[in-house]
Amino acid sequence: MNKTAIALLALLASSASLAATPWQKITQPVPGSAQSIGSFSNGCIVGADTLPIQSEHYQVMRTDQRRYFGHPDLVMFIQRLSRQVSNLGMGTVLIGDMGMPAGGRFNGGHASHQTGLDVDIFLQLPKTRWTSAQLLRPQALDLVSRDGKHVVPTLWKPEIFSLIKLAAQDKDVTRIFVNPAIKQQLCLDAGTDRDWLRKVRPWFQHRAHMHVRLRCPADSLECEDQPLPPPGDGCGAELQSWFEPPKPGTTKPEKKTPPPLPPSCQALLDEHVI
């Protein structure tokens, strides 16, 4: 499937979810031992943790949306990464969407983030902490040129390279999605230490943030992991293909109905949503 078709599918998946979903009616984590269930784009979570809003190392954006829930592994990853960044004097980590209290489908903006193992992190590290007003209405910093072929040199900073590299080197991280132009710049800057680049995957948009995804926890037996990224640093022909014009004759895919929920997620909805 070519990249244009993939983009249209992603857009349709997002558009199909614009109507309110029953998952929004669950306002607190479902009690129980932490279990990520299903796939990243069709799943849920039992026993989610709440990311503490107050921290000296990070700040949480758009708290009014209440998307700061996730598997304990995700909460620990955020705390671990932000401590590393702080200890290196790089700035404050800005945390975007994680998941809803029980995971599940959003009413827009995300096709994934459903199992408590995904988090969006802004690609800027302010030295001065943001105000409450800034956090509620954050201003994204678009790092990619208008033509989409490279990063904006005046905006690309060594600490952003280091932030992505630190995240990719974390033992629990399986993928990081960034714009192809950002991946390209990482490839140029990486030098000889390149193993971590395998986890950094080019994807549509993601011009101002990275989307970090963790592996399925070993004790989440109903969690469905993605296949590992292809071997290598991903800096060759695969990356360059993202900068090629779409092939002629690309047709808009048919609108698809979301797949059935995993049985455990459907049972969770049946029990907790009237």
UniProtKB/Swiss-Prot annotation:
GO cellular component terms, A-Z: outer membrane-bounded periplasmic space
Subcellular location: Periplasm
Span of the signal peptide: 1-19
Domain of life: Bacteria
Positions contributing to Zn(2+) 1 binding: 110, 113, 120, 211
Entry binding sites for Zn(2+) 2: 147, 150
Disulphide-bridged cysteine pairs: 44-265, 187-235, 216-223
EC number in record: 3.4.24.-
Keyword Zinc included in the entry's annotation: yes
Annotated GO MF terms: metal ion binding; metalloendopeptidase activity; serine-type endopeptidase activity
GO BP of this protein: peptidoglycan metabolic process; proteolysis
Keyword Protease: yes
Cofactor(s) this protein cannot do without: Zn(2+)
Positions of region (Disordered): 227-274
Cofactor note: Binds 2 Zn(2+) ions per subunit. Zn(2+) ion 1 is bound in the active site. Zn(2+) ion 2 is bound at the dimer interface by residues from both subunits.
Pfam families: Peptidase_M74
InterPro entries xrefs: Hedgehog_sig/DD-Pept_Zn-bd_sf (IPR009045), Peptidase_M74 (IPR005073)
This protein's UniProt keywords: Disulfide bond, Hydrolase, Metal-binding, Metalloprotease, Periplasm, Protease, Signal, Zinc
Assembly, per entry: Dimer.
Similarity-based family: Belongs to the peptidase M74 family.
Function recorded in the entry: Murein endopeptidase that cleaves the D-alanyl-meso-2,6-diamino-pimelyl amide bond that connects peptidoglycan strands. Likely plays a role in the removal of murein from the sacculus.
Name of the protein: Penicillin-insensitive murein endopeptidase
Annotated organism of origin: Escherichia coli O6:K15:H31 (strain 536 / UPEC)
